[in-house]
From Swiss-Prot:
Family designation: Belongs to the UTP25 family.
Location of the region described as Disordered in the Swiss-Prot/TrEMBL record: 1-161
Protein name: U3 small nucleolar RNA-associated protein 25
Classification via InterPro entries: P-loop_NTPase (IPR027417), UTP25 (IPR010678), UTP25_C (IPR053939), UTP25_NTPase-like (IPR053940)
Lineage, uppermost ranks: Eukaryota, Fungi, Dikarya, Ascomycota, Saccharomycotina
Any one Gene Ontology BP term: maturation of SSU-rRNA from tricistronic rRNA transcript (SSU-rRNA, 5.8S rRNA, LSU-rRNA)
Biased composition (Acidic residues): 40-69, 110-150
Length: 716
């Protein structure tokens, strides 16, 4: 296989190429591996530390990438480990006695088993795979597409084939100009309302011609082109029939369209088995095609024929799944194992030790909070998965992995390591399916890390890692991979940042499908509060989303604050809820320097002693006014006592918070500290808050509040 690689001309010396080929040949003979390689190797991408909530707030210093020519041959695992071993020590408080020694043994044994070291680790792994393939394996693995004579029909019926192998160079060049260079508007071609499912869908296609024709919707997975091993595992676990919602969602996913799906409640986890099925189907189809084409090339070589078969990217990883916590990662990996049909899993015990903890938050907390923070809630991890015909290897190196699961912060620490020599991003160059799950949790951690990852996705690699250019698809070489990458986004509720992933950062030529829950006045959050309390929605003018923070601030200090004591029936118990931390700092500074209010302020960075003291002083009336942030409420879910008047500087992104905040007043009413008829809730909003407004008042009322002549609306 090594002889098929084309020579590189990017400043790589002839001696280095020869050395790479020699090591490639050596690595396939296990007995020839040197003990020194065993000692130097670290094949563990995960980091043994339980970072606290504030770890997600670390900012990565961005530096200019132009002109950068450092030697980045070091493994991505080593880059992450070296950085974190010095800064983040493993905290034993979340592991049972004896677990630490078990993890250490797992680490030691992993290092001993995988003695691959040096700058050519990705070449060694790939060489190992290619040289171990025989024709019998190729035939047995190709359990669906075994008829080569039917290749033309397959291209038109199998979305995998038509999406990645059918597009011509001319078509992609034309679409690249329309979508990326001219930035022409996408067309909305279909809107559907599924009343029985309480959702609606919107389909957008790119300018020009879309890539894939739509698939016929089916209630049976067997009618789609899914690998037999995956299909059998799925049907054995979940049955042969799909529900209406499952069939509605799986159709665009299998058709390689971008999907934005709101699952509404953490209890709805059916979508996860659908995207893991799709990820495995994609991985196994990719592997089958490579194996088949390798056999064809061997046969053509024996017959002295020249054959061009392009079926690969620059690097092996094809699926990236971003998740907020190790517990979420553990659940997804378990789902992948369940559907993969693999007979054995390497490093499974080590994975369980580092990712699984049997722990749940107190029963007094809300259910969604307990789900978000259960188990190992560390937000610092990355792990590679490599599949073979019968086995799965956990903790595989990046460049030999098929699927990478990572938290955005864990991945961004590799992509923008302060030490330039340890930076790696080449392994993201050939990602074909991006999945971002539990987006709302990730957003509460730090969405900037997601933006960092998106910046490096499908970027042409700095080095080519002995890639065989005769096998690389032309759209990868021409830097057009982003036009074919599928992005799947799953969230409980939509926010502008999450919506932006599909709307502005995705260019999939197969199109985009956005699912949206139907929220009317009956099932809106406002209707579920259970308190007949006065709720006043006050609209202010804002010319653009960019000017919205300034317009909101000016309106608040000029119109709301001066009349606050006049409009409120109580002089104390005034809470101001502020979703944005930057707005919070701005208002806090104004109250401190320009008013005489006796106020307190608590946020996600406040010490525990300050949190306790400030809450007590507010409940007793010593502090008249309290500033309270959304992220603090997310991470602590306090029940604040003493609230009589509630001012929402902005709408909460999570509609559940709206109900919980208003129930602070309900608590005061129950304690007979205030009268329900005299209590007040005032909400500040602009027309740019339509997305958040819909979740609270419903799809019918939101357009009226945003666009009518009146600026003030009262509900009870």
């Amino acid at each position: 296989m090594a002889k098929q690689f084309k020579r590189k001309s990017n400043g790589v010396s002839e001696s280095n190429r020869k050395r790479g080929r020699q090591e490639l040949r050596k690595v396939t003979r296990t007995a020839a591996r040197k003990q020194q390689q065993d000692e130097n190797h670290e094949d563990d991408l995960d980091v043994n530390n339980d970072s606290q909530e504030d770890n997600s707030e670390k900012e990565i210093d961005e530096e200019d990438e132009e002109g950068e020519r450092d030697d980045n041959r070091g493994k991505a695992y080593s880059a992450l480990l070296t950085l974190l071993k010095s800064e983040h020590k493993e905290k034993p408080k979340n592991v049972t006695s004896g677990s630490s020694s078990q993890v250490e043994k797992a680490n030691a044994s992993d290092s001993e088993d995988d003695g691959i070291a040096g700058a050519n680790v990705e070449e060694e792994e790939e060489g190992e795979i290619d040289n171990n393939v025989d024709e019998n394996e190729i035939v047995s693995e190709s359990d669906v597409d075994d008829d080569d004579e039917d290749a033309t029909n397959r291209l038109s019926t199998d979305p995998f084939e038509s999406h990645f192998n059918l597009p011509s160079d001319d078509y992609l060049a034309k679409e690249e100009k329309l979508v990326l260079k001219d930035n022409e508007k996408w067309r909305t071609v279909d809107k559907q309302t599924y009343s029985d499912l309480a959702i609606s869908s919107l389909v957008q296609l790119p300018p020009g011609e879309p890539l894939n024709p739509p698939l016929l919707k089916s209630s049976k997975l067997s009618e789609y082109t899914i690998k037999k091993r995956v299909l059998d595992s799925y049907e054995q676990a979940y049955g042969t029939d799909l529900s209406d919602l499952e069939s509605t969602l799986i159709n665009p996913i299998l058709n390689y369209r971008d999907v934005n799906f709101q699952y509404k409640s953490f209890k709805n986890k059916f979508y996860r088995r659908l995207y893991t099925l799709h990820a495995l189907n994609h991985i196994f189809k990719t592997r089958d095609r490579i194996l088949k084409n390798t056999a064809k090339l061997h046969a053509a070589k024996e017959d002295s024929e020249e054959l061009e078969l392009r079926d690969q990217g620059f690097t092996r990883p094809k699926v990236l799944i971003m998740l907020p916590t190790r517990d979420a990662c553990y659940e997804v990996v378990e789902q992948l194992i369940k559907l993969s049909g693999t007979e054995q899993q390497e490093n499974k015990k080590k994975f369980n030790d580092q990712f699984y903890v049997k722990a749940t938050p107190p029963a007094t907390k809300p259910e969604d909070f307990r789900d978000a923070f259960k188990g190992n809630n560390s937000d610092f991890f990355c792990i590679g998965l490599k599949f073979t015909r019968k086995s799965l290897k956990l903790y595989s190196s990046f460049y030999s992995s098929d699927i990478i699961l990572a938290s955005p912060i864990g991945l961004s620490m590799i992509l923008e390591n302060p030490d330039k020599k340890k930076r790696q991003y080449d392994f993201l160059s050939s990602i074909e399916v991006l999945i971002v799950d539990k987006c709302n949790q990730i957003e509460m951690q730090n969405w900037d890390h997601v933006n960092t990852v998106m910046k490096y996705l499908n970027k042409v690699p700095k080095e080519f890692h002995d890639a065989d250019f005769s096998r690389i698809r032309m759209w990868s070489i021409n830097d057009q991979a982003k036009l074919l990458r599928q992005t799947l986004v799953f969230c409980e509720y939509l926010t502008p940042s999450i919506n932006n992933l599909i709307s502005s950062k995705s260019y999939n030529l197969s199109g985009k499908v956005k699912f949206k829950p139907i929220i009317n006045s009956e099932n809106s959050m406002m209707n579920s509060i259970g308190l007949k309390i006065k709720q006043i929605f006050q609209r202010f003018d804002s010319q653009s989303p960019l000017q919205d923070p300034d317009s909101r601030y000016k309106y608040f200090i000029n119109a709301i604050l001066p009349s606050l004591l006049k409009t409120s029936s109580y002089e104390d118990g005034i809470m101001i809820f502020i979703p944005s931390y930057f707005d919070y700092l701005r208002v806090k500074n104004y109250l401190k320097t320009s008013t005489k209010f006796t106020f307190g302020s608590i946020d996600e960075y406040s010490s525990q002693s300050k949190l306790t003291k400030t809450r007590q002083e507010f409940a007793s009336g010593k502090i008249k006014l309290l500033l309270y942030t959304e992220r603090l409420h997310y991470f602590r879910r306090y029940e604040i006592s003493g609230v009589k008047t509630l001012i929402m500087y902005g709408l909460p992104s999570n509609p559940l918070f709206y109900k919980e905040l208003i129930r602070f007043i309900g608590k005061s009413v129950f304690k007979e500290e205030c009268d329900l008829d005299l209590a007040l809730v005032k909400i500040l909003f602009s027309k740019w808050d339509a997305v958040n407004l819909e979740k609270i008042v419903g799809n019918e009322r939101a357009p009226v509040l945003c666009n009518s002549m009146n600026e003030l609306y009262e509900f009870r």
